[in-house]
Amino acid sequence: MGNLPPWVIGVLAGLASSTLYAAASGGATPAIVLLYLSPLPIFIAGLGWGSMMALIAGGTGLVLTSLFNGISSGVVYLAVEVAAPLWLMRLALTSRAVGGRGASAAARAARAREAHHRAVAAGEIDGPPDDLPEPEVTWYPPGLLVVWTTAIAASLLLISILSMTVTENGLRGAIMQMINTGIVDTGELGRVLDARGFDISPRAFLAGIASFVPAMAASLWLIMTLANMMVAQLILVRLGRAARPTPSIAELRYPKLFLAIFPASLLFAFLPGEAGFAGASLAAVLFIPYFLLGLATIHAISRRWQARSAALTGFYTALVLLSPLVAVLVGCLGLADAWMGLRERYAPDLEVA
């Protein structure tokens, strides 16, 4: 890719993103995975070649999706797959030189150094390439990137719930209608539940599922958006194109105000009706950052362990095999770290940022 003009990389990234999105729109359940991978090419373009290339990628994907899938599909693609990555990458590429020389100082220095290298290669300037050391800069904190991603996921969730309050039974009723494709009326679901020994009516079972779907969808979007950003960064590091250094998960930290929102949402969960439904759904989404904080605590404290690699391998194996239980325990560890400062106690040499 090094010989391609940057705008071509942006166009190719947009083409790849729109192709993944179109493949996921086919309706097959396994293809849904492609929907969550759709922002990955845009993240690669932005974190490797700058925000303008991400904008070109997003614009290309929007045009192609609108042309082949319709304007409404293009609007959804823009809102869910493009807007958030563009904003998150703009934040991720923000840096400030130590000493106050202004924002994005590292990016400006990198562009100047690259221009100097091109001039030397073209014979416009005599002498070797400029090998001045990188300026000392501070980058946008990873914790704030998680906060912004969580805020976007929570906003999409609340908009979905509020927009359906005028309909009968709200968002849960709409989801029940969508997943009830005759399986209740034909008695098929009832037979399956009876065969498995569940003492619950088919409609009550569907109502329970409908209550979990919004929070599950928002949580999965949050996790996959952060995962796409991380995977894009790892790919770019391997290619030598990463525009910023890779942050350490052990140094993750959130603002105190953000930490207070989770207990507030738990209080709303006890309210009746749609308010309680919104509070419970929001609490589920806001628990994800605490899960990440729990991972940060484990990585920080384990730095002193002699068999750290084996311990982390065993932990992540347990996380995969016993996913829900271990995830909840890790989230509780994150809660304890947020309010009790476990990393400051057991990893005092760690610079938490």
What are these regions (language model features)?
Residues 1-57, 306-320, 325:
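Hydrophobic transmembrane alpha-helices
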Residues 7-15, 55-59, 74-79, 145-146, ...:
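Hydrophobic alpha-helical transmembrane segments
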Residues 30-90, 333-340:
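Alpha-helical membrane segments and adjacent membrane-interface helices in multi-pass membrane proteins
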Residues 100-139, 146-149, 153-210:
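Membrane-interface interhelical loops and short interface/amphipathic helices
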Residues 135-143, 204-219, 244-264:
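Membrane-water interface at loop-to-transmembrane-helix junctions
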Residues 213-240:
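Transmembrane alpha-helical segments in integral membrane proteins
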Residues 237-296:
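Small-residue-rich helix-loop
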Residues 272-353:
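Long, positively charged, glycine-interspersed low-complexity recognition regions
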